[in-house]
């Protein structure tokens, strides 16, 4: 069998793109170091996500469009797989006054039942905050959704090869796949070190969460201001307080993800227990119900696990574009090629292309279906152009 394209990476972006390409009738194969069944691997971020649809993209940007496309497709997933995707109440709360443009999100007319909130004697907001807004949106079970996508892709006959690429050139002629003219680079953090890409703008956005058990808790609460700032000896604020969020998971387990942390260029995969305590305190302040009907403090919250994930972020903006290039003997020099494996760097010199789709940071799940749609548009356009040229 010959393939139209190879997708590098089996996180939520790579899997979503592979499925979309298959939907369009293209023959696709996948190659990745970490696979969906590696749900305890810290080598990729997807299994560790809190996973809700709460866009923090700036309105009118490509990222906002990806989020909107994804949102429009989640209703079907929630209907077919309520154990993977569920529509629940959301709220975002804060204390400091904001202008209307700051306090109203671009997606207020997209989500369900949006309304502005203000604390009154008769209406107290989460954490005793003064302002907020509420709506209904979707939460997903990240590790199970990744496994679901992977199982669906395998059921369609799409091969997924476990292989660690050193250079992008290798992907154009892999054993068991053969020659292709197009590769989709959804390698996430791997784009920083993959020879032939080596994107210096890519960085790790370390996240840490606490998975807890709180049966019956079904509300997603976001608090971007945080409660506790780091102070110096005189009591002055050194850094602003980290945000806090509460994201229930679909399914019967009663699991809830508590966060949050976003630490740029921190590559540690070890949980920081001091940070975990801060997360538990913050989330208890927002929702004491997490501690159960008899709970009296954050210490009564039932902890399941401490988790760390490295978000594949990128300076400026995510990268979604096509790059035309060459592979084969003499095609590339420098940029690490002197130490690259010879496989993929030798042989017939030919023109190829790569569609880059990485650097989405914290927004992987909520942007995945939109990003897959736009990446697939680029793939189709390129392959159509090659077929047209071949006929001339």
Curated annotation (Swiss-Prot):
It catalyses: a D-alpha-amino acid + O2 + H2O = a 2-oxocarboxylate + H2O2 + NH4(+); D-methionine + O2 + H2O = 4-methylsulfanyl-2-oxobutanoate + H2O2 + NH4(+); D-serine + O2 + H2O = 3-hydroxypyruvate + H2O2 + NH4(+); D-histidine + O2 + H2O = 3-(imidazol-5-yl)pyruvate + H2O2 + NH4(+). The keyword Flavoprotein applies. Catalyzes the oxidative deamination of D-amino acids with broad substrate specificity. Enables the organism to utilize D-amino acids as a source of nutrients. Enables the organism to utilize D-alanine, D-cysteine, D-histidine, D-leucine, D-methionine, D-phenylalanine, D-proline, D-serine, D-threonine, D-aspartate and D-valine as a nitrogen source and may also contribute to utlization of D-tryptophan, D-tyrosine and D-asparagine as a nitrogen source. Protects the organism from the toxicity of D-amino acids, including from D-alanine. May play a role in its interaction with the host. One of its GO terms (molecular function) is FAD binding. It holds the Pfam family DAO. It is found in: Peroxisome matrix. GO terms for cellular component: peroxisomal matrix. InterPro entries: D-amino_acid_oxidase_CS, DAO, FAD-dep_OxRdtase. Keywords: FAD, Flavoprotein, Oxidoreductase, Peroxisome. The keyword NADP does not apply. PROSITE patterns: DAO. FAD binds at residues 10, 13, 33-34, 45-46, 50, 52, 311, 361-362, 364, 366. Its EC number is 1.4.3.3. SUPFAM superfamilies: FAD-linked reductases, C-terminal domain (SSF54373), Nucleotide-binding domain (SSF51971). It comes from Cryptococcus deuterogattii (strain R265) (Cryptococcus gattii VGII (strain R265)). Anthranilate 2 binds at residues 56, 262. It comes from the Eukaryota. This is D-amino-acid oxidase 2.
